[in-house]
Regions:
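Short, charged recognition helix plus adjacent turn
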Residues: 3-4, 12, 17, 55, ...
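The DNA-recognition helices of helix-turn-helix-type DNA-binding domains
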Residues: 31, 42-43, 71-72
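Short basic helix-loop element that most often maps to the first helix and adjoining turn
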Residues: 7-27
Length: 76
């Protein structure tokens, strides 16, 4: 079973930096529907996409895990 990631901090960073997901998607080079699939764990971010997002959002290397690799806590 693949892990599900919690992208809530990434979403907050996108809104704080670009004001809208649409503006971020234009700079990032993906459609809003593609980003939505990634943020909802239907598709995964590739390593080059993570690097590009970090560059656009000015996320330091030491903080990448906080934005891209925090797993969701499953509720029972």
């Amino acid at each position: 079973m693949n892990p599900e990631f919690d992208y809530s901090k990434l979403n907050e960073k996108i809104i704080r930096t670009f004001l809208t997901r649409t503006a971020f998607c234009e700079a990032f080079g993906v459609s809003t529907s593609n980003l939505s699939l990634k943020m909802n764990n239907k598709h995964y971010f590739t390593q080059p996409q993570i690097a590009k997002a970090c560059s656009l959002l000015k996320i330091p290397q030491s903080q990448v895990g906080k934005y891209f690799f925090t797993t969701k806590i499953k509720k029972i």
